Amino acid sequence: MTNMRKNHPLMKIVNHAFIDLPAPSNISSWWNFGSLIGLCLIMQILTGLFLAMHYTSDTTTAFSSVTHICRDVNYGWLIRYLHANGASMFFICLFLHVGRGIYYGSYTMVETWNIGVVLLLTVMATAFMGYVLPWGQMSFWGATVITNLLSAIPYIGTTLVEWIWGGFSVDKATLTRFFAFHFILPFIITALVMVHLLFLHETGSNNPSGLNSDADKIPFHPYYTVKDLLGVFLLLVTLMILVLFFPDILGDPDNYTPANPLNTPAHIKPEWYFLFAYAILRSIPNKLGGVLALILSILILSILPLLHTSKHRAMTFRPLTQFMYWLLVADLLVLTWIGGQPVEYPFIIIGQLASIMYFATIVIFMPIASMIEDNMLKFT
C-alpha cells in the first residue's frame, strides 16, 4: 500500500499534497479554514447539482420551481437551505482565511496570495449570480442595480449593460445566462483552487511565528488531517443548526415575493456578505467613483505585498500593527452594518467615514505602524 501511495502516478500527487506533505509543527486552528473552504466548495457543488435537476431558468417558472423544490422534492427544503446557508458559511470561512493571511503575513507568498484574490472575486461573482436565480423581488432588483453599475464605464457602459442583460432590461435572457454562469463557475473555482494549492506547496505553509520553519516539520497526516476533522465537525454542526432551526435568518423576506418589475422594494440590498462592499459603493455620490471604490475594496488585497514595510513577516510580535488590524476588522463590521441601513442621515456620513477609514488603514496606517515598530527595535 505504501509503495502504491508513493509510486502510483495519481496517488503520488495526493500523497504529496495531503499525506506526506511536510507542515510546520506550530500552525494553529487559523490554518484550518483552507480545508473548510474546500469542504464548503464540495458541498455547494453537490447541493447545487441536485437543485439544478429541479430548477427551471425561465422568468415565468423560476420562482415556482424553487417553491416546488421545497414542497414536493424529497428533502428538497434541506438541499435548498444547505445551499443557501452553505454560501454564508463559505464566506465566513473565506473572510477568516483572508484575515488570517493578512495577520500572519501570508501575502508575502505573492503567487498563492494573488490566485487567492482572483478566487475571492470569482466566488463573489458566483454568489451574486446565485442570488438572482430564485427570481424573488430582491433577486430581480439586486441584479438590476448591480449590473446597471457597469453603465458607469465611459463610452461602452450602456452597450455593455444591454449585452449582459441580453435586452433592454433584466429579463428571461439574463436569468438563463446567469444560471449557466452560476453552474460553470464553481468548476472554474475548483481548477483555481488546485493552482492555489500548487503555488502554496512550492513554498510551504506559513506559521504563527512568521519565521522559517524548515528545521521543524511534521507530516500532514495524521496530525493535521485529524485537526482539520475537528474543524469540519464544528462547521457541519453550525451549518445544521442554521439550516434546521434558523434557515431564513440570513435571507431577505422580500425574496419570498415573486419578482415584479413594476414594484421597487423600499430598500434594495445584497446578501450580508456583500454589505461591506455595498456600503463602500454607496458612500461615494458619483456613480463611476462608487464602482471604482467597490472594485478597489477587493483588489486592494493584491497590493498588500507592496505595502509590507516591516522586518517581521507576521503581526505576532507587532502590537501597534495589531491595533491597526483590529481597527480594520471593527471598521469592516461597521461597513457591514451600514450596508444594510437605508440611505439617510446619520448612516450616510457613518458609511463615508468608515469607507475612508478602510482604505486609510490599509494604505497609510498599517505601513506607518510597521515602520514605527521597526525604528523602535533599534532602541531595544
UniProtKB/Swiss-Prot annotation:
It is found in: Mitochondrion inner membrane. PROSITE patterns: CYTB_CTER, CYTB_NTER. Heme b b566 binds at H97, H196. One of its GO terms (molecular function) is metal ion binding. The keyword Heme applies. It is a multi-pass membrane protein. Keywords: Electron transport, Heme, Iron, Membrane, Metal-binding, Mitochondrion, Mitochondrion inner membrane, Respiratory chain, Transmembrane, Transmembrane helix, Transport, Ubiquinone. Its cofactor is heme b. Pfam families: Cytochrom_B_C (PF00032), Cytochrome_B (PF00033). One of its GO terms (cellular component) is respiratory chain complex III. Binds 2 heme b groups non-covalently. Heme b b562 binds at H83, H182. The chain crosses the membrane at residues 33-53, 77-98, 113-133, 178-198, 226-246, 288-308, 320-340, 347-367. GO terms for biological process: mitochondrial electron transport, ubiquinol to cytochrome c. It comes from the Eukaryota. A ubiquinone binds at H201. Its main location: mitochondrion. The cytochrome bc1 complex contains 11 subunits: 3 respiratory subunits (MT-CYB, CYC1 and UQCRFS1), 2 core proteins (UQCRC1 and UQCRC2) and 6 low-molecular weight proteins (UQCRH/QCR6, UQCRB/QCR7, UQCRQ/QCR8, UQCR10/QCR9, UQCR11/QCR10 and a cleavage product of UQCRFS1). This cytochrome bc1 complex then forms a dimer. Belongs to the cytochrome b family. Heme 1 (or BL or b562) is low-potential and absorbs at about 562 nm, and heme 2 (or BH or b566) is high-potential and absorbs at about 566 nm. Component of the ubiquinol-cytochrome c reductase complex (complex III or cytochrome b-c1 complex) that is part of the mitochondrial respiratory chain. The b-c1 complex mediates electron transfer from ubiquinol to cytochrome c. Contributes to the generation of a proton gradient across the mitochondrial membrane that is then used for ATP synthesis. This is Cytochrome b.
